[in-house]
Structures are given as C-alpha cells and as structure tokens.
C-alpha cells in the first residue's frame, strides 16, 4: 500500500502515540522488565499522568528515548514511512523531539516531524522544555493547532475554507 501511494506521488505519514502506553497499574510489560524506569513517576511512586491516559513515558531516560528513536527509524527504513505525527507531543521533551528529527533527517532530509503541542494533563516534563517548544523554534519539528485545523475543515456550525466559508 505504501508503495502504491509513493508511486502516485503521495507521501505517507504515520500517526504515532509515544506519550503513553497501555497498562496503568503495576505489572505493565515495561515495568515488569525494568521497574520504575520506563514511566515518569510521582514522589510516591505513582504514575505521572500528563497524557490523560494513566501514564507518561520517560523519554528523559536515555534508553526510553533510544527505544522511541529506534522504532521510528525502523518504520522509515523498513516500511518507507515519510514522516510522523506525534500525539500529545507536549509529553515529550524538546531535546527528544529535536534528536528524533536529527536522526530521521539522516535517513531522509524531507522527513516530516510534527505533532500536537499540548498534553492531556499535568506532565512531568519540565515547564518550557516540552515537545511543544521543539515545534516552535525552527529546528525542523512542526506543531499544529486546533484553531488552524478548524479554520480549514470547519466545525459544527462553521464550514471552514474547504467548504467555501472563508474568503
């Protein structure tokens, strides 16, 4: 399917959700492998829930960051994905997003890396160092906004540009 899109001149971007994983209780696959490493934790040992889904991965830990980057490289090299849209990019550090872009750029200088510049709750990422910052400082990582999306596609009661409502 990806080849068919490429043959038609269409790039393929993959929607990725690295901000959290399934399993919000003790005993998740990652916690079973390396307890207390894969997720951001509160002082009492409970999961930080910046994703709004029960947990938030700790991309500030080197091997977690490597896991994310290696998996993205796999999708680009083995499946010829052209870019990635990150769910809740605000739950990932800006330096993580910049490193992701830098590594993927080495594979394809036309790579698209962008995401939602917000979180789903109070994140464990240090204020001012979120992936949202990476999407605003001209380093190749993009961010988008619901207001722009809504202006283009419209919302309930408002048609948007694609439906002839904006001049």
Residue locations for each model-derived region?
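Aromatic- and acidic-residue-enriched carbohydrate-binding clefts of CAZyme catalytic domains
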Residues: 1-8, 22-66, 70-78
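Conserved, mostly hydrophobic/aromatic
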Residues: 5, 15, 75, 86, ...
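Active-site-proximal helices and loops of the catalytic beta/alpha 8
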Residues: 6-8, 88-167
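Short, well-ordered coil/turn segments that N-cap beta-strands
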Residues: 8-10, 15, 80-82, 108-111
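Conserved structured core elements
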Residues: 11, 62-69, 82, 90-98
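Conserved beta-strand edge residues that scaffold enzyme active sites
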Residues: 18-20, 90
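Short N-terminal helix/helix-N-cap motif within the alpha/beta-hydrolase-1
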Residues: 21-22, 94
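Glycine- and acidic
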Residues: 57, 81-86
């Amino acid at each position: 399917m990806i080849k068919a899109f490429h043959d038609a001149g269409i790039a393929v971007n993959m929607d990725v959700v690295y901000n959290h994983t399934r399993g919000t209780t003790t005993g998740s696959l990652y916690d079973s492998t390396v307890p207390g490493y894969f997720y951001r934790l509160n002082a009492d040992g409970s999961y930080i829930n910046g994703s709004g889904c029960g947990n938030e991965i700790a991309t500030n830990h080197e091997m977690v960051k490597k896991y994310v980057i290696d998996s993205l490289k796999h999708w680009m090299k083995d499946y010829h994905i052209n870019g990635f849209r990150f769910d809740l990019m605000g739950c990932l550090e800006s330096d993580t997003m910049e490193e992701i872009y830098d590594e993927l750029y080495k594979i394809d200088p036309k790579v698209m890396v962008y995401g939602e510049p917000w979180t789903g709750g109070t994140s464990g990422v240090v204020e001012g160092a979120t992936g949202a910052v990476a999407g605003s400082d001209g380093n190749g990582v993009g961010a988008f906004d619901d207001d722009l999306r809504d202006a283009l596609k419209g919302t309930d009661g408002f048609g948007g540009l694609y439906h002839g409502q904006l001049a």
